[in-house]
Amino acid sequence: MASVFGKPRAGGGQQSAPLEVNLAILGRRGAGKSALTVKFLTRRFISEYDPNLEDTYSSEETVDHQPVHLRVMDTADLDTPRNCERYLNWAHAFLVVYSVDSRQSFEGSSSYLELLALHAKETQRSFPALLLGNKLDMAQYRQVTQAEGAALAGRFGCLFFEVSACLDFEHVQHVFHEAVREARRELEKNSLARPLFISEERAVHHQAPLTARHGLASCTFNTLSTTSLKEMPAVAQAKLVTVKSSRAQSKRKAPTLTLLKGFKIF
């Protein structure tokens, strides 16, 4: 049976239940978050979209021969992280996006990684994050070098990629599937660590919202010092993937888009 998005599932035999993964796309306005999301879901590149539109999309994917029900939240923060509990408490993994031709968007991505590090420290949990330099097709106007991107990713212990949403679908798909793999590893680790029995009832302590505990207004991190944060432990060296221009088209039939309201698709 064919899926709405992603690869159709093979027929015959008993299918295992799909893994459910929630992925939040973070970054400053103009970094290309919506373009990446639409490219992944439809193989198409959009030239116009509403920067204030935030929505969540679903895609049936197959990653490493395992069915995955992937939900992608295309967030609509403007210039700084705001009302961040909506995705911090929802996502299993995060894709932090900046544009290689914008120093401001790169600095904004650092704020998002700091936010995730603080959230991990407060919750005593690990949240996989991938740093993505977008608009590689604009490399002649670079303001952020590959080395700077790799250094920032290494500082927070996350994977690093550079892609272009308008050029190559396969590499964009690879990044999203890597996010699924990172989330799956973390989910499996948490599942193994979960106790099998609860011997006694324990009082549940409700923590105050992230902003209230740290005196932060709407999760804005403009004045947050990086030295006050305990960075996420580096589980692996930052990996750099540089995507070159490619016009090769995949043979997979382009899926039908049903949820992308407010986009002008070409």
Swiss-Prot record:
Protein EC: 3.6.5.2
| Alphabetized GO MF terms | G protein activity; GDP binding; GTP binding; GTPase activity
Spell out the reaction equation it catalyses: GTP + H2O = GDP + phosphate + H(+)
Which parts of the chain span the membrane according to its record? none
Q: Which family does it belong to?
A: Belongs to the small GTPase superfamily. Ras family.
NCBIfam families per the UniProt record, alphabetical = small_GTP (TIGR00231)
What is the name attached to this protein's record? Ras-like protein family member 12
